[in-house]
């Protein structure tokens, strides 16, 4: 899947696209450099599965979007190995192992529902230090 397509879908979401499903993320999390932090993504329709192709997108303070994870656990080219995607229980998860101050950003989860993407509201990650 092309990352540009996912990012364009994110922008389209802000224009008022409507879906029956609701994707929920933590609104904010705080961690310290070197710590491991896990962000989660829950679906109102039930358990998140590999068929939802969970994607994770990072938005830095300068408003640039970077695709991190596609298809639940596939890192995009050039994304550091400290970022990993998985399914934990009934949720999709993004784990940052050994967080760095440069990881401070908003992280959006997107889930696929048959013919469209639905995005969560984003998790604002603060990295102290």
UniProtKB/Swiss-Prot annotation:
Residues 1-19 form the signal peptide. The keyword Ligase does not apply. Keywords: Adaptive immunity, Immunity, Immunoglobulin, Pyrrolidone carboxylic acid, Signal. Residues 20-125 form the Ig-like domain. InterPro entries: Ig-like_dom (IPR007110), Ig-like_dom_sf (IPR036179), Ig-like_fold (IPR013783), Ig_sub (IPR003599), Ig_V-set (IPR013106), IgV_Light_Chain (IPR050150). One of its GO terms (biological process) is adaptive immune response. GO terms for cellular component: immunoglobulin complex. The modification Pyrrolidone carboxylic acid is found at residue 20. Pfam families: V-set. SUPFAM superfamilies: Immunoglobulin. Compositions and partial sequences of RPC 20 show no differences from MOPC 104E. The sequences of J558 and S104 seems identical with that shown. These proteins were isolated from serum or urine of tumor-bearing mice. PANTHER family: IMMUNOGLOBULIN LIGHT CHAIN (PTHR23267). This is Ig lambda-1 chain V regions MOPC 104E/RPC20/J558/S104. It comes from Mus musculus. The lineage of its organism: Eukaryota, Metazoa, Chordata, Craniata, Vertebrata.
């Amino acid at each position: 899947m092309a990352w540009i397509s996912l990012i364009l879908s994110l922008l389209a979401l802000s224009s008022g696209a409507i879906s029956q499903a609701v994707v929920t993320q933590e609104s904010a999390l705080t961690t310290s450099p070197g710590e491991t932090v896990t962000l989660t993504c829950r679906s109102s329709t039930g358990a998140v599965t590999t068929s939802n192709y969970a994607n994770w997108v990072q938005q830095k303070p300068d408003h640039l979007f970077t695709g991190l994870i596609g298809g639940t656990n596939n890192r995009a080219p050039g994304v550091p190995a400290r970022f990993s995607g998985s399914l934990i229980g009934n949720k999709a998860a993004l784990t940052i192992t050994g967080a760095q101050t440069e990881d401070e950003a908003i992280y959006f989860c997107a889930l696929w529902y048959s013919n469209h993407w639905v995005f969560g509201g984003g998790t604002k990650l603060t990295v102290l230090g």
